[in-house]
């Protein structure tokens, strides 16, 4: 008997289409897996068994009538930063502990239209601020490969549930690496689309000029199938780009002969572990063997400034976006009967966690009179320089190849009291958000039993190219097929 929880989207779809399994069977298998593993992994904020089984039943009826799409009947999970009508959406914050949205995020509606089955909402760093999922106001998600390690963040629950085979796929959000870094730590495929490719409507905002929604899957083909479902223009999101959505799965034939790939030197900095560099070199050898040309002498000299730029711009946007949480309109309220200003002050003091408060303070400082030009405006100028450097590089190369992270999954609590060390986890991913580029992290091996991720960065809206390279690499390797022993 096929182990149903190990199936990819493509494999599940074929079995459903051939009537060899039902969505109800597939969904029950994943719910049983969740029940078994959640006490240890803690990937889910909310599990929705009744909703899932009802949606699975509807999917089975549609399949019997011959109405089946690539995601019909496929069990999935959503990061708890995406609004779900009638289902609690907390952002893993006390501030939204009991918030139930009256509407769905655009991507949630699109997945429902495709017939996907919602298993539940996943844990995350509070308001998507963090790199380990330790900043959740409720509990810390654990890495399925080693439960003493973090799964990455901020979308740690979404990465962990796919790695642990608790869901066939999941959605996360990526502001500075929050899909790709946990994908690397959990050895799954994690994709950040081009900025504007996927509607952010119904995504609780962290930094609006950087946020983007994307999938976690078991391989690049599955990633393409999910992107086919969620990409596209939405007039409710002013940053959504009105263009024809490509078929992300077309051209995934394993052939990248003649592709020109660049390797930026700045991504192999002093804080990069040598054993990770070794794994990336092995991966470059695979890509070269597939017929791609590799140039290891690419330079993007403004890369070292990206971290500083990010930690001025992202907190600045966050301080504005989070000003709406005042204890009056919705969400947590400390004591609405007190003086309004005092109640608002105490609501924010007790409703937000320490990392969120830290970033609000940084952002408020950067936007304040006397510092706006010195910090915020200057950061925007450097952002432009970083984007221009990428554009110049893409005049010569089809894609850029880097490590996803400079470090391996670290122990729970190891970096929690050192914000700078935590921020350094995203040095390889942040520049891509600053430039609005597409990028994917795929499994590239293991060091000491812990996963290493390879990052493939594409030109703006050349999302298909990144997918083609990722798929070709996975056709030639088997790292993505490895699963943790649980």
Swiss-Prot record:
List the catalytic activities from the record: L-glutamyl-tRNA(Gln) + L-glutamine + ATP + H2O = L-glutaminyl-tRNA(Gln) + L-glutamate + ADP + phosphate + H(+)
Q: Does the keyword ATP-binding apply?
A: yes
| Active-site residues, record numbering mapped to chain | 79, 154, 178
Which InterPro entries does the record cross-reference, listed alphabetically? Answer: Amidase (IPR000120), Amidase_CS (IPR020556), Amidase_dom (IPR023631), AS_sf (IPR036928), GatA (IPR004412)
- An annotated GO BP: translation
Q: What is its EC number?
A: 6.3.5.7
Q: Where is the signal peptide?
A: none
Source organism, top-level taxon: Bacteria
Q: How does it assemble?
A: Heterotrimer of A, B and C subunits.
User: Which family is it part of?
Assistant: Belongs to the amidase family. GatA subfamily.
What name does UniProt use for this protein? Glutamyl-tRNA(Gln) amidotransferase subunit A
């Amino acid at each position: 008997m096929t182990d149903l929880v190990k199936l990819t989207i493509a494999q599940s779809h074929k079995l459903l289409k051939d009537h060899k399994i039902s969505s109800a069977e597939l969904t029950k298998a994943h719910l049983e897996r969740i029940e078994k593993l959640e006490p240890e992994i803690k990937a889910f904020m909310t599990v929705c068994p009744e909703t899932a089984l009802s949606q699975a039943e509807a999917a089975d009826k549609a399949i019997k009538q011959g109405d089946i799409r690539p995601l019909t009947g496929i069990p999935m999970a959503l990061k708890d930063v995406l609004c779900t009508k009638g289902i609690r959406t907390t952002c893993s914050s006390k501030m939204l502990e009991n918030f139930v949205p009256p509407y769905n995020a655009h991507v949630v509606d699109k997945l429902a239209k495709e017939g996907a089955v919602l298993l539940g909402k996943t844990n995350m760093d509070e308001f998507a601020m963090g790199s380990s999922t330790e900043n959740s106001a409720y509990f810390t998600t654990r890495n399925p490969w080693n439960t003493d390690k973090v799964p990455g963040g901020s979308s740690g629950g979404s990465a962990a549930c796919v790695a642990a085979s608790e869901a066939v796929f999941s959605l996360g959000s990526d502001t500075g690496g929050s899909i790709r870094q946990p994908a690397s730590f959990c050895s799954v495929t994690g994709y950040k689309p081009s900025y504007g490719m996927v509607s952010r409507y119904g995504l609780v905002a962290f930094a609006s000029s950087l946020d983007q929604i994307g999938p976690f899957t078991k391989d690049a083909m599955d990633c393409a199938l999910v992107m086919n479902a969620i990409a596209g223009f939405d007039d409710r999101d002013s940053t959504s780009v009105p263009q024809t959505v490509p078929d992300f799965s077309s051209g995934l034939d394993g052939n990248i002969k003649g592709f020109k790939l660049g390797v930026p030197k700045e991504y192999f900095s002093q804080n990069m572990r040598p054993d990770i560099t070794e794994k990336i070199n092995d991966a470059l050898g695979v890509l070269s063997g597939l017929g791609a040309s590799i140039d290891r002498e690419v330079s993007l000299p403004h890369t070292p400034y990206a971290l500083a730029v990010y930690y001025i711009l992202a907190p600045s946007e966050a301080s504005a976006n989070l000003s709406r949480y005042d204890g009056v309109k919705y969400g947590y309220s400390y004591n609405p009967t007190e003086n309004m200003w005092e109640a608002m002050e105490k609501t924010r003091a007790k409703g937000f966690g320490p990392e969120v408060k830290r970033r609000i303070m940084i952002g408020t400082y950067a936007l304040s009179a006397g510092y706006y030009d010195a910090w915020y405006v200057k950061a925007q100028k450097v952002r432009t320089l970083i984007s221009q450097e990428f554009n110049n590089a893409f005049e010569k190369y089809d894609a850029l190849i880097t490590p996803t992270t400079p470090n391996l999954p670290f122990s729970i609590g190891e970096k929690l009291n050192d914000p700078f060390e935590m921020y350094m986890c995203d040095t390889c991913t942040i520049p891509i958000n600053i430039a609005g580029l597409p990028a994917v992290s795929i499994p590239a091996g293991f060091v000491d039993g812990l996963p290493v991720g390879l990052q493939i960065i594409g030109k703006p809206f050349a999302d298909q190219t990144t997918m083609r390279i990722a798929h070709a690499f996975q056709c030639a390797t088997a790292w993505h097929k490895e699963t943790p022993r649980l």
